[in-house]
């Protein structure tokens, strides 16, 4: 899994590429939590995500709970 981060003022965008599974979910969680201070909009670009496991979904739920307190979270380019 590769993560490209872009931060503009209070918006943090993570473009994720590859698989989010039990091996890579902790990396995603660490990357998310490292830059959330002062962020009011978290954007996750799933255009290049091939797979997400329940461990990855847990990380997303945790991020959503945090963002509910300080702003909003948006998922983009999610496949069906």
Go through each PLM region and give its residues.
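STAS-typified acidic loop motif
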Residues: 2-30, 47-48
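Amphipathic alpha-helical interaction surfaces in cytosolic regulatory modules
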Residues: 22-80
């Amino acid at each position: 899994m590769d993560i490209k981060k872009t931060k503009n003022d209070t918006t943090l965008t993570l473009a994720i590429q590859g698989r989010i599974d039990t091996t890579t979910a902790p990396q995603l969680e660490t990357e998310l939590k490292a830059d959330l201070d002062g962020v009011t909009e978290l954007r996750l670009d799933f255009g290049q995500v091939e797979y997400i496991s329940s461990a990855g979904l847990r990380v997303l739920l945790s991020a959503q709970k945090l963002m509910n307190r300080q702003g909003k979270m948006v998922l983009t380019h999610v496949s069906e």
